[in-house]
Amino acid sequence: MTRHSFSALVTLALGFILFGTTSARARAQTTPQSAEAQPPAQTADDDDDAKLRPLEPDFTVVNLPTTLPLPMGAGNFHLTHRFVGVNWRRDDLSTIASNLFGFDGPAVIQLEYRIAVMKHLEAVVARTNFGRTIQFSGKYDAIHEGGSHPFGLSGIVSVEGENNFHSTNTSGTDIGYAPAIGVALSKALGRVASVYVDPIFVHNTQPIGGGAEKLNTFYVGLGARVRIAPSTFVVAEVSPRVSGYKPGDAEMAFALEKRVGGHVFSLVVVNAQATTYAQLARGANPETLYIGFNLARKFY
């Protein structure tokens, strides 16, 4: 990634944040007559980041981001495991059973922590042992779904680097960094389900051996969460690549999810080791299926 492209990404991110802040101030400065003539754009209850959102228990679908807000000063810890020692699509039943369905094998693990540094604004850091990748990201929860808004919207920016956030990978090859920018859109369907659309653009997804036209990937993540009990959900997502570098298959995942207080646990079936935005852009190997889990804990 060139210095110019990284600077452009940072400029876009700051512009998005400043635009949201300026818009909020402009609404606050409306005249009393205007306030009496029109209902507020967002009620206090809609704007409460700590409000329980029964159909949105976690900050991810499986790997894709949601629009769940985080109260200012609060935090959230997220752990993912993908057991890659057994491939459920290629290995026979005896191999799968003898390896305890994959739990005996090695795992791709990601640790993530996010904190709300301002109202509606989250800072996130994640580290996975897949390529020793570290990802820094920010999320601005611009719109909360409620009585005055038919959907939720969050803006996302990130940058990640392999080999503990270096420009060289674990083999010593200079591959640069992979910044991303996108949005997460959410919509509740009554009291039963929520759906997500996450268009995301990632730069530098094919840094080795490709022409300039293959250096970027644009994908649109699609997700759904269906409630089958008061705090139990069936979850699914897919991340089809629309343009740019598109190796292998699109990432797909399914999960059975349970919320208990501030904890969320998901038993996951997924076709990729990917958890970061650039890894999702690079897709999955054909005929691959792993078992794993997600575990999250809110601190508020």
Report the location of each language-model feature.
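Transmembrane beta-barrel domains of Gram-negative outer membranes and organellar outer membranes
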Residues: 30-170, 176-182, 186-205, 226-229, ...
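Short helix-loop boundary/capping segments
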Residues: 195, 209-214
